[in-house]
């Protein structure tokens, strides 16, 4: 198969300083605000503004360091975050294809995918860089990871609209952080965390609800089927199988011995079973 290149939408612009998206002059909404409004309206409650600002500033700094490495091979030797990012890329075989790749639904929404990694001629994976406090794999941070899942799912949905001939293999969070805590210890995290994509229908419904000014309700996930195994029955059948095979082996050995003594090469039982020596 011939390699399929990424499509870049003519007229789609991202003004990074103001974090605004435009398509041929029409302003589009980013998905981050939609996710907050529709699904996690209280996620920032009680967090002082100066902490939010400091977190955003740190995140922007790390994003830029990683982007400069991926796009320009500019290496910041003092950045532990870059060292950890490069280690993750080596461990998981990530092949950088694009950073801050713009996607859109061509009507109301747009976003910039942090990372797009090439998997094959027609397949990519999409990664999102997170520098937030707290291990995202821990139960206490389940909501943070679910927010990432929704964000990546919307990226995937719009990526496929922009690139209808391509496929998306995996969605994952690259959680990279190295900050000094108040007690002087180092809060260092370097993890790749896979997330399961939401169905395309759910992504469309979420964005449609936002356009209509309606409140979106996330469909309940189907309960996971539990695997049940009757271990005692399996053990009994395996034991029976072993005993039967042992008896058959003894019968076969005796028959072959008797046939050899009688000079017979073929024997057919009264019920039609044919035995050949």
PLM regions: where:
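A short, compositionally biased
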Residues: 14-18, 168-171, 259-264
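Short, charged, low-complexity amphipathic alpha-helix
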Residues: 200-253
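A residue-level signal for conserved active-site and pocket-lining positions in enzyme catalytic cores
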Residues: 62-63, 155, 237
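Extended, charge-rich alpha-helical segments
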Residues: 84-91, 242-277
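Short, charged/polar micro-motifs that form catalytic or ligand-binding hotspots
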Residues: 48-56, 141-149, 234, 238-241, ...
